[in-house]
Design a protein with these regions (language model features):
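A cross-kingdom feature that marks ATP-driven nucleic-acid transaction machinery
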Residues: 1-27, 33-46, 50, 70, ...
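Interdomain hinge/linker elements that couple catalytic modules in large macromolecular machines
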Residues: 2, 135, 139-318, 322, ...
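Short glycine-rich substrate-engagement loop in P-loop NTPases that contacts/grips substrate
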Residues: 45-73
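Catalytic P-loop NTPase motifs of RecA-like helicase/translocase cores
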Residues: 54-56, 81-83, 111-112, 179, ...
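Conserved P-loop NTPase "ATPase switch" module shared by AAA+ and STAND
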Residues: 70-85
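Conserved catalytic/switch belt of AAA+ P-loop NTPases
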Residues: 86-110, 117-119
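A short beta-strand-to-loop transition that corresponds to the Sensor-1 phosphate-sensing loop
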Residues: 105-109, 115, 130-132, 387-389
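Short regulatory helix/loop adjacent to the ATP-binding pocket of P-loop NTPases
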Residues: 110-126, 138-143
Length: 407
């Protein structure tokens, strides 16, 4: 297997020179450990995983002894299993002031962050690793996605061009490293195993009373609503659980890095806006598996093609920021009259409205809705329609046409 270089590597090197502690979060099997072990090659950094029950026991019951056994520089894998370590890592960092002393990984984002914020504030750099991005798979320099003509032109030169069929093959295959690298050639078998391990292991770590079959029905109901506003009542009905359970289980999915939310854009000058977030999966391959699409071809022609394409584009844009160690300020716009903008990208004091469509020939009617942002206190800048057009183009002077493969 060839190692796929991760865009986050340069950020890891940078923060290792500046902070005593690095924490890389992200769901299981996205390559956190693989990336860090690759960067460790030729160094004296040690490695220990808390998946090892004996090591976990020592870390929880005698964290001081654990750090004597595993002296820095060290990589501690799955650190969420022993939050007792954080206080002792803080003591070590304050005493020795050694940049890069501790590399930590963890798969339970919110649970981890609570302990980190309480114990390691100011001493830790936190980075998020997701499944592979388009840029990592096909090559090209990673920069945060912007609706800037110079940036878009540069992307057009670097990225690997793909037609509609190829885009839907990427969407259907998913972006987990084991599938993309060829370790697991059967994506259906991979996701079946992934879900079983995920539900029986990680979910039960957070809630041991969960019924596995009910949770599988639940996550399937959630996948069927990717790209939609969250409706816990509908999800609960389809999964045969109560609404409180549905909300709690959505929190578990977010905690484990399976889903994320796009919150509605709000501004004190904009009135009558909805307040409900939209829900997306980090990996569209998992969505396709859960919603039982048999091939990329059937998905491309199916009823969910628009929703899953939107999920793919939003997730890919989000990755371009996370892979540079930056927070993505992505929102969506929807008012009480159901007028909607798929993405509102806020950066550098401007707003870029973005629509996502399966068409290859978007028209001016798609960008009329962008004018709704003109009432906001933050100025509206260039807009874009991300679609299946083969190359970079424009609808007019203020709105570009951007192929999906250029993200």
């Amino acid at each position: 297997m060839n190692y796929i270089k991760r865009n986050l590597e340069n950020v890891v090197r940078q923060v290792t020179r500046e902070y005593p502690v690095l924490l890389v979060t992200g769901p299981r099997q996205v390559g956190k450990t693989t990336m860090l072990q690759k960067l460790m090659e030729g160094t004296e950094r040690g490695y220990v995983t808390l998946d090892d029950l004996n090591e976990r026991y020592i870390a929880k019951t005698d964290p001081e002894l654990f750090l004597q056994l595993h002296k820095p520089p060290v990589l501690i894998d799955e650190v969420q299993y022993a939050p007792e370590l954080f206080t002792y890592i803080k003591i070590n960092a304050d005493k020795n002031h050694e940049p890069g002393a501790f590399w930590l990984t963890g798969s339970q984002v919110f649970k981890l962050m609570q302990g980190v914020q309480e114990s390691l504030a100011g001493r830790v750099a936190v980075l998020s690793l997701t499944s592979l991005s388009q840029a990592e798979i096909s090559g090209g320099t990673m920069k945060p996605f912007t609706v800037d003509l110079e940036d878009l032109s540069e992307r057009q030169k670097e990225r690997e061009q793909a037609d509609t069929r190829e885009i839907f093959e990427r969407i259907y295959q998913g972006s987990m490293p084991a599938i993309v690298s060829g370790i697991n050639s059967n994506s259906q078998l991979f996701y079946s195993s992934y879900l079983s391990t995920y539900i029986e292991r990680d979910v039960r770590e957070l809630s041991d009373a969960i019924d596995s079959l009910k949770f599988l029905r639940f996550i399937t109901a959630v996948a069927a609503r990717c790209g939609q506003m969250v409706n816990a009542a509908e999800i609960a009905r389809d999964a045969d659980i109560n609404q409180t359970q549905a909300k709690d289980w959505l929190t578990i999915l977010e905690t484990l890095g399976i889903i994320f939310y796009l919150h509605p854009y709000s501004n004190n000058l904009l009135k009558r806006l909805v307040k409900t977030p939209k829900l997306y999966f980090y990996d569209t391959g998992l969505v396709c598996y859960l919603t039982k699409w048999s091939s990329a071809e059937t998905l491309e022609c199916g009823a969910m093609n628009g929703a899953i394409l939107e999920n793919y584009v939003v997730a890919e844009i989000r990755k371009t920021y996370l892979n540079c160690g930056k927070e993505p300020y992505l929102y969506y716009y929807r008012d009480k009259d159901a007028r909607e903008i798929d993405i509102v990208l806020e950066h550098d004091g401007i707003l870029n409205p973005i629509e996502i469509k399966k068409t290859a020939n978007p028209g001016t009617e798609l960008v009329k809705v962008f004018e709704l942002l003109d009432k906001a206190s933050t100025p509206r800048a260039k807009g874009a329609v991300i679609c299946m057009k083969p190359g970079l183009s424009a609808i007019d002077r203020d709105n570009y046409i951007v192929p999906v493969w250029m993200i």
